[in-house]
């Protein structure tokens, strides 16, 4: 899995630069020639769109203008990658809902698997044209980590515009030293990451470490490297790492539990009492309506939600995530009741559990 940010593809004068993409394409070609399968997660559609309509962000609403630029630039982005390869390049656009909904998540996995079987090179991007801003995945680092787990990748390579992870921000601290090997993403390591990186993209070093943590939970190592350095990219093509290696977690969680833990969450939560909290975290129990104190948001049956312990603020600690068997409206009506009362209260029942333990992961 290779993730390429827009800052590595954007030309100084606007649009996309084939010169910067060439080295990364050579890295891809070397891996393909070695018989490896590879998936690319590539940003750059909005940057490409700005070259077509440079004043779009000045005259339109920020969200609508960005979505329009993404629509204009996505074709340019795919064309950029296609020019480097003889094999077909497949465009795959994903949204928050595609990863949150279990059926669509599995369908995306099947599609990507078939593309790889057919010898195509999938190039994935978030579908900015239709993504609702408050439900956006946020950055392609996060998307790359989830897709890496989706396709059961062996490694996640994240191309950056610096040489990897440093002990401090090298742009502002001359004493910053590069870290070649990170056995574990401790709080101290996470604190080394600064804020945003280039002003072209949306992801800084912090998001890259968060992506590495998500990939690591699926047993996938992450490599951060300087995608602008031809020397570094050529070394990588020869399997000689020049950058930062971040080890996978010692214990790999099961595929379904990974999805429950890391898939995007609907804007909603189920509030539970102390007894239910103890049952979930200590006994691995399902969540029954008797332990439910209420619901936040307007989620539907089958949505992924957070499960929070109720406190005096009404918005307590998030203890778990899971797929709700009932809508927020239904949960408010059956909260605190016995499971046998569900059908009498609602007029129907989807079972005794609000969230079944097989559809739940404790954080």
UniProtKB/Swiss-Prot annotation:
CDD domains: AAK_G5K_ProB, PUA_G5K
Protein name, as recorded: Glutamate 5-kinase
GO cellular component: cytosol
Record localization: Cytoplasm
Main location: cytoplasm
PANTHER family assigned to the protein according to its UniProt record, in alphabetical order: GLUTAMATE 5-KINASE (PTHR43654), ISOPENTENYL PHOSPHATE KINASE (PTHR43654:SF1)
Gene: proB
Pathway: Amino-acid biosynthesis; L-proline biosynthesis; L-glutamate 5-semialdehyde from L-glutamate: step 1/2
Catalytic class of the enzyme: transferase
Family annotation (InterPro entries): AceGlu_kinase-like_sf (IPR036393), Asp/Glu/Uridylate_kinase (IPR001048), G5K_ProB (IPR041739), Glu/AcGlu_kinase (IPR001057), Glu_5kinase (IPR011529), Glu_5kinase/COase_Synthase (IPR005715), Glutamate_5-kinase_CS (IPR019797), PUA (IPR002478)
PROSITE patterns with a match to the protein in the record: GLUTAMATE_5_KINASE, PUA
Binding site residues for ATP: 3, 160-161, 202-208
Start and end residues of each PUA domain: 267-349
Similarity field: Belongs to the glutamate 5-kinase family.
Positions contributing to substrate binding: 43, 128, 140
Biological process per Gene Ontology, one example term: L-proline biosynthetic process
Catalysed transformations (reactions): L-glutamate + ATP = L-glutamyl 5-phosphate + ADP
